[in-house]
Amino acid sequence: MKQKKSIYYKSTWDYKKIRPKIRCFIEDEFVIDLTKILEDCDKTESGYLDMRGFDFSNLFSSQSAIDTLLKEYKDEENLKTHLSKYGWSEYAINSFISQSKSQPITKSYHGVFIIRLGYKQKIDFSYSESKFATEINENLDDCIFEDCKHNIEFRGELTHCIFRNYKTGCPYIGSSNYNTKCTFDNIIRGNTSYLSFKPNVTYQSCKFLHTHFKVVSLHGTVFDNCVFDCTMEGEGIRPIEIPDFLDELKYRFSLGLGAIFNGKIIPVKFINCDLSKLKLKNLKISKGIKFI
């Protein structure tokens, strides 16, 4: 049934028709602005903007990159002037423009693609896909990511978002900033098994369900009022240890003096969490860790 739904939602998108609505421009990174697409979105039966089945990899046609960019910058000189404002060297600019005349943007540009949505609330991305390394920097609230295959990193805050049956190309789960009241249910890492939590990120009132985390290290992550019904397994010959304050201090010393004075030293914290169904494999928690 899910496969049929996925095929149906994917078939509803006419990328040739919607590409003229996309703005493409370069700031510090390459930005793909989808505001016009979301403006014209229908709503689901639940009242969400309907982005179900959207394939972010189909945003670009096979036309040369220069054709895509000149829609925004009009001519090459304007493009060169714009790139120089963002610190591009003359050599880098000329090389990029040369490649852009013979290759699509996905081959001529080697950085990360930034997706700009223009909308931040109540979007349903179920059955959507993305193959390229992309980022969404906006804060998102009450969005649905079910049965997705993504290579998206979330830089903004996530609130009330649902990730279910979610296959990711990224090594970390959720936002690399702050996560509040999000559900992570059956998260699967594609290609490799490493799936963990980004250092110095807070998860507030989140649920981690039916997921097998493969942890190489864990530093500075705060879990506040979270529920764990999942497995955490250490990746290594010896058991991985979740560090307390002293262990974290030793770790900073190993990185050099700059790491010691670069911000507060925050050990991993579990504050009022339900760990009754958390399974640990090849992983142990330092005695100094406090379960508040």
Kindly give the residue locations of the regions a language model identified.
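Tandem repeat scaffolds
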Residues: 3-16, 20-292
